[in-house]
Amino acid sequence: MFVHRLWTLAFPFLVEISKASQLENIKSLLDIEDNVLPNLNISQNNSNAVQILGGVDALSFYEYTGQQNFTKEIGPETSSHGLVYYSNNTYIQLEDASDDTRIDKITPFGVDSFILSGSGTINNISVGNQILYNLSTLSMTPIFNQSLGAVQAVLADNSSIYFGGNFSYNNGSMTGYSALIWDSISNTTQLLPFGGFGENSSVNSIVKLNNDNILFAGQFYTLDDPSALISSSNNGTNSTSSLNATTLELGQRIPLRYASWDSQGSTTFASDSLVCPNTNEDAWLYPDTSGSLVCNLPYEVSPTKIRLYNSQRSDSEISVFQILTDPSSSIMNLTYLDPLSGELKNCGEFCPLYSRATLLSASQNVSSSMDMITFIDNNKTDVKWTSDFQDFAFVNELPVSSLKFVALNSYGGSVGLSGLELYQDTFSTYANDSLNEYGCSALTNDSSSSTLSSNDWYNGLTGESYIAAKYVPDQNEPIPRVKFYPNIIHPGHYTINMYTPGCLQDNTCSARGIVNVTMWNQQNNTIMKTYLIYQNNDNLKYDQIYSGYLDFSPEIVLEYVSGIYTTNTATVVVADQVNVITVSLDAFNTLSDSSNAKKETLLNGILQYQKSNFTSTRLNETKVGNTTLNLFPVKNYPKNSSLYADIYDNKLVIGGVSNRISIVDLNDDFEVTSSKNQTIQGDVHGITKTNQGLLIFGDILSSNNQSAVFLFNGSFENVFNQSRTVNSALNISLANNDFIVLDNDYVVNASSNALIRNSSSFSLSLWAAGNNGDGDVLFSGAVSHMQYGNLNGSVRFLNENEIEPLNLEGGIVPYLGAYLNESATAYAYEVDSLNKIYFSNEVYPSWNWSSGITQMLYADNQTLLAVSAGSSTTAELSIFDLRNLTMIANETLGSNARINALVNFEKNCSMLVGGDFQMTEPNCTGLCLYNYESKTWSTFLNNTIFGEITQLSFTNSSELIISGLFETKEYQSIRLGSFNLTNSTMIPLLSGSEGKLNSFTVTEDSIVAWNDTSLFIYRNQEWNITSLPGNASSISSVSAIYTDIESNTLNKRGINNVNNGSILLLNGNFNISQYGYLQSLLFDFQKWTPYFISETTNTSNYNPIIFINRDVSTEFNSQSPLANVNITVTSPQSTSSQPPSSSASSESKSKSKKKKIGRGFVVLIGLALALGTVSVLGIAGVILAYVFKDPEGDYKPIKPRIDENEMLDTVPPEKLMKFV
């Protein structure tokens, strides 16, 4: 598994950066400081003496302020939508964001900036406006003045930034769809030269091919400026069109069978002939050179053009006319293709209508039928002429209820028409099938139709086209149903809308219901789309039910589902019309029947945009050509495909639908030279570029029918298998590892393809990420990263900032240790609710305890191991002979007892037991003597030392230091005392009613005691109290680390107490606002330094502790025999005839003494601790300290310069209270 520095994996392409381009700058801007650790002289040479036991699973040494924000495992409460910066193993939180903010894409730009795309806000700036985030200044600037919506692709091309997605942007003169350019130098926004990719399009990928060519991939088939797709060819050969221009109709003829006409004054009028033109006879004649004809439509329409057939008689042919409409009551502006000049012209009050002879002559002189037709309004309307008629397109598409045709002049003496037709650019199919009828037998096969269920349908309001039926369920009535059959004549792309009349006008809002609309493919009887539509809309509305390619006529079924309001028994179901809008037709692909035909470049989700084509000044320059790259998806993918693309090693990878991924080889001119397909099962939803290659993901199934994610780096490799579709894949490099994050749910190691699960050592939430290649990584999400993970419960230090797992045999997780000798250590551990001991020389004794082991003491001369165990209700003492692993003694103390400390008197075969207990036989309170040879208990000094004992330690064989909260006959509330075993005298070192001390340690020149929240330090002849920094901090243990680099001081106390220094290593839980939650601090008696943060294993019942694996036998074993354990403790006799009168006099005496005595002698019992040889000198040190102390042993704490925001730098000498 992954252990050292999170993982031992290292990839050759991931080189650790010594200094990121923006890291130091960001640190400076945010006042982030590096945490420099002192030299602790910890190395493997001192037998790995410093260890952490107790279930540690992950650990990070504190290296910089703010690191704590990235060490807690990610959970549901973690904020993961802000911005995080990473470089050189440093994480920095740059911005926070609420959960409704979503950054979907981060794109590097320049050497110091990134572009953020998404939704929501950061610092009140809309992410949808696209944000330029500058690392040099940590500033954010919105790029656009409006939200773009869904941005799916961003490409930085020098100073131009291309945005692609599903959005629209209006530059004041034109609306562009799905693409936009921002110029970073001029800070201006512009559409592409061709606008965009048309309505209902989307851009999924933008790929830079070279400085002149950019590839767009997505779902589109046209451009906002379709003229860019038109090119002229003159190859000297004729080709035959599959569809002649004269037969192509983009719009639908509006049925006029039920229109009413006003032909007052006419000599001839036949409406049936007028709307169904017969080129051999006139349908309307008026006996003057001017006249009018009015058509009142059965319902309101928005016509796009009118087609006029001039009179068959030369004397009645109209030469000039105009069109007026209601309700606008205005003359309509018209556009027509002039048969004589071939130009597109406009007219209004006076529009020319050519004679049949003129049209016939013009038609005989054209070189191609394409000269008789043109397309306007983005190819939605065709305007043409033939020898029989002329088309006039309405410049303004307005609603029309009545149309008046006015003949203003004639080529002869009267005016007349043989035909009049209206067209609209939509195909309407009405529920009232009579409105679908043209009334012309020749057009029967071209008309749309509908059928109704056998309910009582009735017409809606007068002048409206809808019908309605009242329906009461469970009354043996058929379910109201309407089937629409829109007639699709030409294959192409269409949009279909279902119209629903409003309920306010007919006052049926409270009775309206819910209908289901289903679109069927009649060729294979499959459902294409289905929707629920609520019909209680106040006004006329439409719902889009389809947009895409059709080469057949579908069936659309509207059917009652339920009422909306439970109070109504009857539901009014309404049905109006299905509206089909032509987007583009395949017929455009083949419209050519001459050598000079204009050809349209076909698109299907891929566009090769060559910038120079749009800047060239040459006439007839092709803007978008039929390049092999543009034509590749046209020939190889279904129409209207949604495609994704990217480049790897000069190979273009294309994915989308149709169960394949295409690998396209390109030459230097980006021409397709070859291609091959990788067969897959499913559709591609995206392609992401990673350090290893291209990641291809989507609804792709592997051979075992699980979702697959492929990596392409010249060949295909499956990197993920799960039972779900993958909609997002991101790549990020952190901590010398490369990760792939799928749907912000799965994290995959990119080298091994191993799935990484969130843990205490590493967890990641990732919405978007960007890397500028200079070592700056910016991502939206959250991360928890501990330097060392999977530590298996215990570690040893290799140096002051490097560790490795202890890895004891059998996966043992120890929580307590005891040094035996240079080759063996005893460890306490728990397994199956039993507590046991393991020896590191792989010896497993059979002993076990039901309660946790609290103390272990080893006597080397006797090879004896004393073990105390206990719970909240009982305590147990066990003593073993390690020569044969036999138990010497086993004792259980009474209820509510706890053993805290043990020291051994070898000569007496007795163990002095300290703790929190009460014994009656013998009478012991907190301190009792146990003879493990006779297996008997006895009082220690007639129980004249009593209370709660927390720690016992010899300074030499006859000096015993005791901590806790205890009393003697002379002193009360002793918290720390020194007891002389030779003369049975007690010297209180610290007294007071503030509570017990938990323990103490002794350095070369200091005594350090502590309770939960403070250190009590005797140094330089004075005591002071140093409170822990921060709030709610607590100490578990304090260890002295000796920093003398000349001696192996971890194995034994230093001898030269002048040159040797020491640093206190605190273990516990420390909450400091500047550093967060820590588990270890360092204190050099002047300032605090954060040391490490750790996490425990889920299975451990113990808190991690620091274990110094060194020989401490002299601290807990005495070679001096106890002369008389039943004498009474006394106080020492003062060497001064008078007690000190004041602090001032005490200070004066101290200074005079200091001139005569070396520093090591002045420290309380320091000589005995440093030399450990002559007990008399130890006694002298204690007495010396006692002479200059207050009778009550009180102390006054200083107020250290420590708060939550700073560490203690130094303690002013004038503020220190003398130990006098």
UniProtKB/Swiss-Prot annotation:
Annotated localization: Cell membrane; Bud neck; Bud tip
Residue ranges, Extracellular side: 21-1162
Topological domain spans for side Cytoplasmic: 1184-1220
Lineage: Eukaryota, Fungi, Dikarya, Ascomycota, Saccharomycotina
Pfam families, alphabetized: Rax2, Rax2_2, Rax2_3
Record's signal peptide: 1-20
Ranges of Low complexity composition bias in the record: 1131-1147
Keywords for this protein: Cell cycle, Cell division, Cell membrane, Glycoprotein, Membrane, Signal, Transmembrane, Transmembrane helix
InterPro entries (UniProt xref): Quinoprotein_ADH-like_sf (IPR011047), Rax2-like_C (IPR024982), Rax2-like_second (IPR048266), Rax2-like_third (IPR048265)
Source species: Saccharomyces cerevisiae (strain ATCC 204508 / S288c) (Baker's yeast)
Gene Ontology CC annotation, any one: mitochondrion
Annotated family: Belongs to the RAX2 family.
Subunit structure: Forms an heterodimeric complex with RAX1. Interacts with BUD8 at the proximal or distal pole in unbudded cells. Interacts with BUD9 at the birth scar in budded mother cells.
Gene it is expressed from: RAX2
UniProt membrane topology term: Single-pass type I membrane protein
Membrane-spanning parts: 1163-1183
Other remarks in the entry: Present with 3670 molecules/cell in log phase SD medium.
Positions glycosylated per UniProt: 41, 45, 69, 88, 124, 134, 145, 158, 166, 171, 187, 200, 235, 238, 244, 333, 365, 379, 432, 445, 516, 524, 613, 620, 626, 640, 677, 705, 713, 721, 731, 749, 758, 792, 821, 848, 861, 884, 890, 908, 923, 942, 956, 980, 983, 1011, 1024, 1031, 1060, 1071, 1098, 1126
Principal location: membrane
Name assigned to this protein: Bud site selection protein RAX2
Region (Disordered) location: 1129-1151
Source organism superkingdom: Eukaryota
Role played: Required for the maintenance of the bipolar budding pattern. Involved in selecting bud sites at both the distal and proximal poles of daughter cells as well as near previously used division sites on mother cells. The RAX1-RAX2 complex performs the asymmetric localization of the two cortical landmarks, BUD8 and BUD9, at the distal and proximal poles, respectively.
GO biological process, one term: bipolar cellular bud site selection
Post-translational modification: Glycosylated.
